[in-house]
Amino acid sequence: MQTQSTCYKGTQKMAIKGVLWHSTGANNPNIKRYVQPSEIRPKEDSYTRDKWLQVLGKNKYNNDWNHIEHKAGVNAWVGKLADGSIASVQTMPWDFSPWGCGSGKNGSCNDGWIQIEICEDSLKDKNYFSKIYKEACELTAYICKTFNIEPKGFVVHNGVRVPTIICHQDSYQLGFGSNHKDTYHWFSSYGKDMTDVRNDVAKIIKETDIKKLYRVRKSVNNAKSQIGAFTSLANAKTACKKAGNDYKVFDWNCTVVYSNKK
């Protein structure tokens, strides 16, 4: 969690209506450029600062978003970790209102939409795009399941009918955001738009509803603490061991099948 940021300190809670995607607009796919751990660790975070720096990589320029000087903030990021793998990192609680899309004539989607920022590369690497697209869809599917969001649905926001899953450019077109092109300027090169995102997220939800998954979280009812859902018990145990003593592995019947506590 980027607890040192102005957004984290100054925002307020929101009623969650949907998910909004951004992309960074800069050629740097590394999450460490934007995300660094706080000096003071939240109690619920089992990772130390040094451990997070090992995972993320250190931003030697100190120009990440976890500072009071930066006047923006989102709920999660998707990009490369220090080892080159693709992952999602949550930086604010899901119900914290982000400062991400600005505002328009009808208001702002900062009020109601969990916002994800995807780290851009040169926009020419199809393999990277495929991986981050998949990761962002899976994260969005998780959010939709957690908060009962219909991925292909709509909500009425300030009198306007708005899709539950949108991007920054969508928010502008609907009168709820500033005029940024993301994510269409990138996605269109690979034949994707937000309709595809909604369909792919819905497909993931349908598939995971069918699959028998092992979920790693603190308690069966604490969905916000979940760090992953796995088809393999061995992989779930590995993730649980890394997460800390408070975490357990639950099967599809909500039964504890592994716990770090002896």
Regions found by a protein language model. Give the residues of each.
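Short aromatic-glycine-(Arg/Gly/Cys) micro-motifs in beta-strand/loop hairpins
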Residues: 210-225, 248
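Basic/polar, cationic surfaces and motifs that engage anionic cell-wall
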Residues: 9-13, 122-210
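A short, charged, amphipathic alpha-helix used as a generic interaction element across diverse proteins
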Residues: 231-247
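Local beta-strand/beta-hairpin segments that build beta-sheet-rich folds
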Residues: 91, 225-227, 257-258
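Short, flexible beta-strand-to-coil junctions
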Residues: 23-28, 81-82, 217-221, 250-255
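Short acidic, glycine/serine/threonine-rich helix-capping segments at coil-helix boundaries
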Residues: 156-164, 225-231, 250-251
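Active-site-adjacent loop/helix surface patches within enzyme catalytic domains
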Residues: 1-152, 156
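Short, mixed-charge low-complexity intrinsically disordered segments
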Residues: 245-262
